[in-house]
Amino acid sequence: MSGTEKKLGFLASGYGLSPKEKDYPVLGFAVDSRKVAKGFVFGAFPGAKVNGEDFIEKAIAAGAVAIVARPEVKIEGAVHLVAENPRLAFAEMAARFYAPFPPVMAAVTGTNGKTSVAELCRQLWTITGHKAASIGTLGVITAKNSYSLGMTTPDVVTFLSCCSDLARADISHVIFEASSHGLDQYRSDGAKVIAGAFTSFSRDHLDYHGTMERYLAAKLRLFDERIAPDGTAVIWADDPAATTVIAHVQKRGLKLIDIGEKAEAIRLVNREADSQGQMITLSIKGESYKIRLPLIGGYQLSNALVAAGLVLATGGDIKQTMAALTLLKPVRGRLERATQSQNGAEVYVDYAHTPDGLRAAIEALRPHTEGLLWVVFGAGGDRDKGKRPEMGKIAANLADHVIVTDDNPRGEDAATIRKEVLVGAPLAEEIGGRKEAIFSAIKRAEKGDIVLIAGKGHEQGQIIGRGETMRVLPFDDVTVAKEAVL
C-alpha cells in the first residue's frame, strides 16, 4: 500500500485535536476492519447492507488510532473524528495521506459507455505522447500492463492508493469510471478532477437507487461537486438527459464541451458506416474534419468522440487528437469481434446488460447484417427486475432470432429470471445453459448472419448463488464462441 507516515494533525486539521493527538503517527487508512493495522484511520460508514459502525471495536482492537464516524457514534480507545458526512471527510483525509496524484485526472459517468470512453481516452492520450492510465471495469490499464481492482469503482482507499502508485510510476494522465454507486458513496473523492464526461442515462441500478431521479442525482454529483471549479464538462448532447446535465454544468460555471449532432463545440455532421468502421465528418471551431474511425456502431462513435472531448478538455491539440482517432483499437468486450462461424457468420460479444445498452448494440450491428441478426442474452439475478421484460421486448423488436439464456443468476432461480425476460419476448427461444445457447446460435447462423452475445462482455465468470454460497464459475463469452467453431 502506498503512502508514508504522516501525523494525524496534518491529516485531520480543523478537528479540535489535542497537541498529543495531533502528534499521533498515521500509517494507513481502511474501510474494512479486517484490513486495519496499528496506526490506521478507520472509516465507519452506515451502509445499505453493512454498517461500518458495527466494526469500530474490532478496528480499535486491531490498532486503529482514529475513527471517522457520525457525531452520535460512541467511541472509546481511539480518537473520534466527528463528521456529519463521514465518507467525504474520510476521503479528504485519505487523499492528504496518499498524495501526490497524477496532475491530470478526468472522470466519466453515464449508464452506458463509461468503460469504452475510459479506455479510448487512455489510448488517445497515449497516442498523443502522454503516459496515461484508465481505472474502471476492466481494471487498471496502462500502455505496459493491466491488473484488476475487482469492481468498476473500488473503495476510496484502493482508489487513492492506486492513483498514488500511478503517480510514482510517472503516469501523468488518468481517467476513471465514476459509477453512480461510487459517486453516491464518495469512493473516488479526494483527488482533484479537472475534466468530467457524461455519456448517457437510462434505466439501471434501481435495485440500489430506488428511483430514476435518485439515480440521475448520483451521476450529477460529478458535475455538481467533483469537477474542480475551473474544470471542464464534456457532454454527449444527443442523449435526452443532456439538457439537465448541461443546466447543472452552467449553474456551476464549468467550461463546457458538448458533442453530437445537436452540439455546438464538436458537431457530428455526417456518418457513413461500413464493415470495418465508419467515416465521420466533424465541425469544430468552424473547421471541418473528415475522420476514418476504425470502430463499428453508433454508440462506439459517441464514446470515441466523448473520449476525444476529454483529451481536448485536458489540453490536447485538436488536429493531433483528430488524427489519433484513426488509430483507436476496439475495447475488450465492447462490440468485440469474437470469431467467424464455419458457415461464415460473424460473432460479436458485448457487455450490454441494460435495455438501452442492448438496443444500442443491436442497432450498431444491424447495418452490417446482410442476413439474420441473432441475439443471445439473459438478465442478472439480484438486480433490477423491472428491466427484464424491457430487454426482452427490445431484443424481440430489433433482432431476427432471439435466444434467452442465463447471465449471472446469483441468488435467484435462473428459470424464473428467464421467464421474466420472456414476458417481453414471448416468441423467443429459451436455452438455459449459456454455453449451449451460444453453441446453438453459432452452429445455426448462416453466411451473412451476425450473432450478438450480450451481457457479459469482458467478464470471466458466471455468478451462481449469493452470500456464503456464492460461486463464480469460469466463463468467457469470447472463449466459448471460439470453441463453438472448432
Swiss-Prot record:
Pathway(s): Cell wall biogenesis; peptidoglycan biosynthesis
Cofactor(s) this protein cannot do without: Mg(2+)
Posttranslational mods: Carboxylation is probably crucial for Mg(2+) binding and, consequently, for the gamma-phosphate positioning of ATP.
Annotated residues for binding of UDP-N-acetyl-alpha-D-muramoyl-L-alanyl-D-glutamate: S33, T152, T153, S179, Q185, R187
GO molecular-function terms, A-Z: ATP binding; magnesium ion binding; UDP-N-acetylmuramoylalanyl-D-glutamate-2,6-diaminopimelate ligase activity
Modified residues (N6-carboxylysine): K219
Job description of the protein: Catalyzes the addition of meso-diaminopimelic acid to the nucleotide precursor UDP-N-acetylmuramoyl-L-alanyl-D-glutamate (UMAG) in the biosynthesis of bacterial cell-wall peptidoglycan.
Protein name: UDP-N-acetylmuramoyl-L-alanyl-D-glutamate--2,6-diaminopimelate ligase
Lineage start: Bacteria, Pseudomonadati, Pseudomonadota, Alphaproteobacteria, Sphingomonadales
